[in-house]
UniProtKB/Swiss-Prot annotation:
Protein name, per record: tRNA modification GTPase MnmE
Locations listed in the record: Cytoplasm
Subunit structure: Homodimer. Heterotetramer of two MnmE and two MnmG subunits.
UniProt: GTP binding residues: 226-231, 245-251, 270-273
Cofactor or coenzyme needed: K(+)
InterPro entries: G_TrmE, GTP-bd, GTP-bd_TrmE_N, GTPase_MnmE, MnmE_dom2, MnmE_helical, P-loop_NTPase, Small_GTP-bd
Gene name for this UniProt entry: mnmE
HAMAP family in the cross-refs: GTPase_MnmE
Native source species: Buchnera aphidicola subsp. Cinara cedri (strain Cc)
Phylogenetic lineage: Bacteria, Pseudomonadati, Pseudomonadota, Gammaproteobacteria, Enterobacterales
Domain TrmE-type G, first and last residues per copy: 216-377
Length: 454
């Protein structure tokens, strides 16, 4: 795809540093070399050069790199200035470059967008670039790099190959009606559909798992009022994040705090006490707490060991019975110093750990720390083969839905025309993942989240 303008942007964060990089992509690159470097450049060679302004005054000295289209990241001519990392120098360089006709400042993610539009990368790989930059754990970096290498895209393309194969086969059969009632053909279609449905189902499971384990671990601290939830968050974060009082219902909103354990970013959420309330604001807080309980990875369900009425079996059973496949609970009984008990761990409901401790007296804290270490170690040990996003999961679900419904309806009425339409829609949603079937709105939404210079 040919663009008639040239884009320029800092590729490094603006600030004082050893090196500052300016990236330029487009048809005006050769003019910029001639005007501001005044040297002849071979592609993919590093040149130590002086950088001049429009009046031939020296601005800086540094390294210049030139990449000739189409063998560049964007598929266009690319030039990079590696100057001293002074924001004044970078600003002067960019202002002078902008004097060249049809050169403008790049939008966020525009370099990656041009790479996508020039078929240098697909949409999954483009997203992976941004994910590498914003990753919050080594696991996320590893998964994003895998996506950048095309691991996820290859899996999608393999399914697409099989879908397109059966689609073309069905279209051919439709054009030869005498074969519609051939039992061998029907059996073959059914077999192929079942195989593809299994492929998508397996990939959807893998995608969902990777989405969970490639992201921050979300741990919700929940329980009745005044059991020590806010004290626990303050203890873990080593600062006063939540207000702690003896008044029930102090926490009404959800308090978020990201804390690093074992090389993993854990998002802890202090939530409103779960109880029946007439207070409108508190009710909203309780609804938010329940919402986060449903979407988190792990629940720290806290109780005051001295208040046995709070430990209601139905209350616990309701949370336990609604746990999702990848969720877990640790029960925490606080304030054991008030009943002269030593800290210990037991098992509740046959499989859930129950930790008895005192935050106030700093008793049993090692059990809690070991539990968090166990959670993060488990997270680190899961092999995340690629980085998954919500839109990938949504598209896979829709693709699978059309295929399952199409197969079921076809087996009832044997209308291949309707099955063909469902397969076409299934293909459409898979193509949306890699960006082969896209809308400008989708692209703008994705690339607007990128930083400037990527």
């Amino acid at each position: 795809m040919k663009f008639f303008d040239t884009i320029v942007s800092p590729a490094t964060v603006i600030g004082r540093s050893g090196i500052g990089i300016i990236r330029i992509s487009g048809i005006s690159v050769l003019k910029i070399i001639k005007k501001f470097l005044k040297i002849s450049m071979k592609e993919r060679f590093a040149y130590f050069s002086s950088f001049y302004d429009v009046k031939n005054n020296l601005l800086d000295q540094g390294i210049a790199l030139f990449f000739l289209a189409p063998k560049s990241f964007t598929g266009e001519n690319i030039l990079e200035f590696h100057s001293h990392g002074n924001p004044i120098i970078l600003d002067l360089l960019i202002k002078n470059i902008l004097t060249i006709k049809n050169v403008r400042i790049a939008n966020p993610g525009e370099f990656s967008k041009r790479a996508f539009l020039n078929n240098k990368i697909d949409l999954v790989q483009a997203e992976a670039i941004n994910d590498i930059i914003n990753a919050e754990s080594h696991l996320s970096v590893k998964a994003a790099l895998s996506s950048l290498r095309g691991t996820f895209s290859k899996k999608i393309n393999k399914i697409l190959f099989n879908l397109k194969d059966i689609y073309s086969e069905i279209e051919a059969i439709i054009n030869f009606p005498e074969e519609l009632n051939d039992l061998n053909i029907q059996k073959n279609i059914k077999k192929k559909l079942s195989f593809i449905i299994k492929m998508i189902t397996n990939l959807l499971d893998e995608t969902h798992k990777n989405y969970i384990f490639s992201n921050t671990i979300k741990i919700v601290i929940a329980g009745p009022p005044n059991v020590g939830k806010s004290s626990l968050l303050n203890f873990l974060s080593k600062e006063k994040v939540s207000i702690v009082t003896n008044i029930p219902g102090t926490t009404r909103d959800v308090i978020h705090k990201n804390i690093w354990f074992n090389g993993v970013c854990c998002e802890f959420l202090d939530t409103a006490g779960l109880q029946k309330s007439q207070d409108i604001i508190e009710v909203i807080g309780i609804k938010l707490a329940k919402k986060h309980i449903k979407s988190c990875n792990h629940i720290f369900l806290m109780f005051d060991v001295t208040k046995k009425k709070m430990i209601n079996n139905n209350f616990i059973k309701n949370i336990v019975n609604n746990l999702k496949k990848n969720q877990n609970i640790t029960f925490i009984f606080n304030k054991i110093d008030l009943i002269n008990k030593k800290p210990y761990i037991s098992i509740i409901y046959k499989k859930f750990e129950c930790i008895y401790l005192s935050l106030k007296k700093n008793i049993g804290i090692e059990y809690l720390k070991n539990k968090i270490l166990e959670i993060t170690t488990l997270h680190n040990n899961v092999e995340s083969t690629f980085l998954a996003k919500k839109r990938h999961i949504s598209a896979l679900k829709k693709s699978l839905m059309y295929l399952i419904n199409g197969k079921r309806n076809w087996m009832k009425n044997l209308y291949l025309e309707l099955l063909s339409d469902d397969i076409r829609l299934s293909i459409k949603y898979l193509l949306k993942i890699t960006g082969k079937f896209n809308s400008e709105d989708l692209l703008d939404k994705i690339f607007s989240k990128f930083c400037i210079g990527k």
